[in-house]
Amino acid sequence: MNILVSPYNKENHYFRSDSTLIRTVPEFYIPDFVESISATPILVFRVDLPGKVIDKKFANRYLGKFMYGVMLTPQMKESVHPDFQEYLKHSLDYSTIIPAIMTEKESLDKFLSEENPFTVEINGWERFRCTQNIPLDKVYEKFSRMTQFCSVRTGDYIAFE
């Protein structure tokens, strides 16, 4: 199982290993080699069918349920070798939080609102609030671009920052 990530307002994508996946984080241990952690909200879809070079008009067949989650990205201490920093940035254990319960993609356009926002709280402080969803056509377009370069398998996750 892979986690493919599409950064916000960028055309590229990268992978996070399945060892980064966790369903809930009641407490997060920050390793000694990490200076700080940033939290990035993500919209995540589960892949229902394997494929490669998937056209935008067929993307809805491949992407299944969705949910919002959070990616934790470490900033390393200067003592960590620069080459190792890039590796750890995308592979720190338990740093991709995707809830186990997901929702049908057909409800995406009505999922968030002012009354039902997605929020990220750190130590009780609200750090992020989202009340609007990414349109499905934009999701399908980015997914199609990703599959031009890599295959997707059933059970993979596609995360959009």
Describe each model-derived feature in a short phrase.
Residues 1-157:
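Catalytic-core "active-site belt" of small-molecule-metabolizing enzymes
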